[in-house]
């Protein structure tokens, strides 16, 4: 996929850079693999804001993605590559030999007409899904499981991948894009290749309104608030906050480590950079 620039006939087009989607499917998604999705506006079941600056946005249909790849030893053909508004990666509609359809994350270089399969004996080919114990060291992977049978959780965003760097004592060692080295059980599945749409990181939305279409509201600075709303708020005239940066609840921010899950720390061989 290439990037698309525009002639500046309006101010919002001057800086706009988008991913060229001309090669993607232009019709509607497969109805049997979609469902409605409710907007939360960043609120939880008590109505309290748990994710700031969310709300509005274009109505979407959720595409049901197969992260587990549980149809073993049944080959499938790629019918089309589609845009998915719910994620940065593209998705592929595949049709199995028994007639069943499914959506999977589309890796780079997967094209219409290609065949994919989930099997222990599958070839090391783009889009095929295998247990880590059957994949040679040095292979680039995506959609990697962390628990057997739970479905892929690692490397699902546009352009991402992990590298298989070792196997030992029932675990595979994978290297993440962040520089972290992590242990994953050898029976966990992973898919060959890198995720599609690597140019996603280079886009420029061009105007605030386009962010609103995506469901993002304005990010208000703490120093622009009142004292009741934020520790940085208040003061006579414009102030700098008067203290080290903190969250609305007073905890240090901008670099302070916040990871709490010590239970899984034993699976991290080397921390991220």
From Swiss-Prot:
The keyword Ribosomal protein applies. Gene3D superfamilies: 2.30.30.30, Nucleic acid-binding proteins (2.40.50.140), Ribosomal protein L2, domain 3 (4.10.950.10). Residues 228-273 are annotated as: Disordered. It comes from the Bacteria. Signal peptide: none annotated. SUPFAM superfamilies: Nucleic acid-binding proteins, Translation proteins SH3-like domain. One of its GO terms (molecular function) is rRNA binding. One of the primary rRNA binding proteins. Required for association of the 30S and 50S subunits to form the 70S ribosome, for tRNA binding and peptide bond formation. It has been suggested to have peptidyltransferase activity; this is somewhat controversial. Makes several contacts with the 16S rRNA in the 70S ribosome. This is Large ribosomal subunit protein uL2.
